[in-house]
Amino acid sequence: MILFPAIDLKGGQCVRLKLGDMQQATVYNTDPAAQARSFEDQGFEWLHVVDLDGAFAGHSANGDAVEAILKATDNPVQLGGGIRTLDHIEAWLSRGLRRVILGTVAVRNPDLVIEACRKFPDHVAVGIDAKGGKVAVEGWAEASELGIIELARKFEGAGVAAIIYTDIDRDGILAGINWSSTLELADAVSIPVIASGGLASLDDIRRMLEPDARKLEGAISGRALYDGRIDPKEALALIKAARAKETA
């Protein structure tokens, strides 16, 4: 299990939204590169980055901040938000990004995702953002009629590295992960699933380490880390102990 600390970028700054609302953004750090270094120093193994402006614009809008992050940390970085073409994917991977996250384009053009997986194996994840059980697109601003599992199953066997599932109704409000829908998705597909949206406390970490949740690749944490509700040392110690137990 991997705990992914999150950096959401708006106007070149690290922010957190409530319920995906760009008008409810709290600035946590004006220096994204420094935040990336801090997460690495705390012992995290990965970094999850979202270009919020890019998600709405349909193209990279915080490119300078992302490049600064890539230079500042040795940790692998996954990036979502505004990545819509094969050229975008290739450009980011060539700059040292480990994994791109395709969200809106996965709904609008699933064949592009499949082609991207062929061209860039192990470097493509699909972001499924859901509100009321339906997939949302364009930076969560538009709802579709597509179901979560229906979309995920389109990519079975394509080589998608992971599905990042975000429950928008819980994002940024520390309500706890939606375990029922997250585990239902993980049971429905063979693609590794990463939980996002609502992670609130060490209890969520402990829940993720229970046998029925170990099929998950990990979880993303934003506000709970920034607000100090989750102590990084304690969280990472729990995960380390669980890994040691599995390999014993």
Swiss-Prot record:
Keyword RNA-binding attributed: no
The EC code for this enzyme is 5.3.1.16
What Gene Ontology terms describe where this protein resides (cellular component)? cytoplasm
Q: What's a BP term from Gene Ontology annotated to this protein? A: L-tryptophan biosynthetic process
Catalytic residues at 8, 129
Pfam family, any one: His_biosynth
Keywords, in A-Z order = Amino-acid biosynthesis, Cytoplasm, Histidine biosynthesis, Isomerase
Give the source's domain of life in one word: Bacteria
Task: Say which family it is in.
Answer: Belongs to the HisA/HisF family.
Its name, as the record gives it, is: 1-(5-phosphoribosyl)-5-[(5-phosphoribosylamino)methylideneamino] imidazole-4-carboxamide isomerase
Native organism: Rhizobium johnstonii (strain DSM 114642 / LMG 32736 / 3841)
